């Protein structure tokens, strides 16, 4: 079955489902690296991608945002001239009660009986004002970092904004 759209998992109304000892098949974390670029660089500007509403961000969306921002920054600024961090981790396990949509499906499936669902993916639960991504650059590369975070924000299902600060 194909993956459901991200809007199906954007909001949450249930407690987090994170206890892996109770889950028979836990889905893998699809984000291979959370820190990219030059972590030891001495940069004077920090740009943060902050969400404005509470919600869930699927690991697929976080990975797409990370790849897009990293590719743009590597091409425009260079690998040694930025540091990018994904600041949230997808702890929450997403479940889906799979349903058939065909003729005679009512004879083959149980409907809402035992409808807890099976694990299909992971998501990060975020609150309003929480940092999702962080980019450190020099002052001359602020415009490129803003564009990279703007492109990353288009992959995230929640409204967000970019905050620019001077590094301490």
From Swiss-Prot:
Pfam families for this protein: Ribosomal_L16 (PF00252)
The UniProt record lists the keyword Ribonucleoprotein: yes
Single GO MF annotation: structural constituent of ribosome
UniProt entry keywords in alphabetical sequence: Ribonucleoprotein, Ribosomal protein
CC terms in the record's Gene Ontology section: ribonucleoprotein complex; ribosome
Gene Ontology BP annotations: translation
InterPro entries, per the entry: Ribosomal_uL16, Ribosomal_uL16_arc, Ribosomal_uL16_CS_euk_arc, Ribosomal_uL16_dom, Ribosomal_uL16_euk_arch, Ribosomal_uL16_sf
Family recorded in the similarity comment: Belongs to the universal ribosomal protein uL16 family.
Protein name: Large ribosomal subunit protein uL16
